[in-house]
Design a protein with these regions (language model features):
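Phosphate-binding beta-loop-alpha motif at adenosine-nucleotide cofactor sites
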Residues: 26-46
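Phosphate-end processing signature that detects enzymes handling 5′-triphosphorylated RNA
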Residues: 49-171
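A glycine- and Lys/Arg-enriched "phosphate-lid" helix/loop adjacent to the NTP-binding pocket
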Residues: 1-24, 34, 38
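Generic alpha-helix detector with strongest preference for long hydrophobic helices that associate
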Residues: 4, 24-28, 125, 143
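Short C-terminal domain-edge/linker segments immediately following a structured domain
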Residues: 16-28, 95-101
Length: 171
């Protein structure tokens, strides 16, 4: 029902999958499907919220869901995923008005390209944390990483990014 699109539904699905595959591994990949209710306006609202979050507007409360896998993922899943190497350094915490502010720097390398981030997590009223992440340069990363919290060790991890049923996952 979109007059601007001329491809068949099958071609549109193939194009959507190709676009998703090209973005796999990006640190801020968000897949925004069609909502069950609310129509196009609801989709635009979700897009705007995602863009504001990426631009640094803090989310009310950080919510992450993690699961422990009982066995390694199937090889075919890893073969179609985008591997991302992460190096993360926790910095000395700072005292904020509502408690300690957790800080870290992180590098993400995908296909030979590295991007750097500085993240703060502040206590939120009623529990939870408000996270703010900003992109930084390599030199800033190096300088901040030198302020590592001596009670922590740097973390190296490999994530495998993929889209399943319209949702982005990092394994």
């Amino acid at each position: 029902n979109n007059e601007a699109r001329t491809e068949s539904p099958e071609d549109a699905i193939a194009l959507d999958r190709a676009v998703q595959a090209s973005w796999l591994g990006h640190p801020h990949l968000v897949v925004i499907g069609n909502p069950p209710t609310g129509g196009f306006d609801a989709k635009l609202t979700r897009i705007l919220a995602a863009v504001l979050n990426i631009l640094g507007e803090p989310e009310p409360v950080e919510i992450e869901r993690k699961w422990l896998l009982p066995e390694p993922p199937p090889a075919d899943l890893l073969a179609t995923s985008a591997p991302v190497d992460i190096f993360q350094v926790y910095l000395r915490p700072e005292q904020g008005p509502d408690g300690l502010v957790e800080r870290r720097v992180r590098s993400r390398t995908h296909d030979g390209h590295t991007v750097y981030f500085h993240t703060t997590k502040r206590p939120a009223p009623g529990g939870g944390r408000v996270e703010h992440e900003e992109r930084i340069g390599a030199e800033t990363f190096r300088l901040l990483a030198a302020m590592r919290d001596p009670d922590t060790v740097p973390v190296r991890k490999r994530r495998h990014c993929f889209v399943h049923e319209g949702q982005h996952f990092e394994l």
